[in-house]
């Protein structure tokens, strides 16, 4: 009924690789409280220029702070100019993304400890430092 009344629409999900390879020259992301979004991780992993404001991974792609749209516009210009000749972009981004994958043994250890504490009804609040890849109790 909602579809017939045009109150909702259903769209086919396009796989990230297809969308980026066929339809995008640059990914511009503005997010709020979704700092580790798989869309820009996928795009950066594939080498696409990603302009974003995710403060948990400012060393990924091309970063602008907070909601600074003028800064974002400057970063878009920088990405357009520098990306075609940046031969280290793909490798750099893959190293950044590995922090959040099974390649990060410290992160896996911390997740296991957190899950064990959860199972045993122990609450421990943690801080994650992306710069040195460390996790510590608050």
Residue ranges and their predicted role:
Residues 22-102:
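Catalytic binding pocket for nucleotide-activated donors in carbohydrate/polymer assembly enzymes
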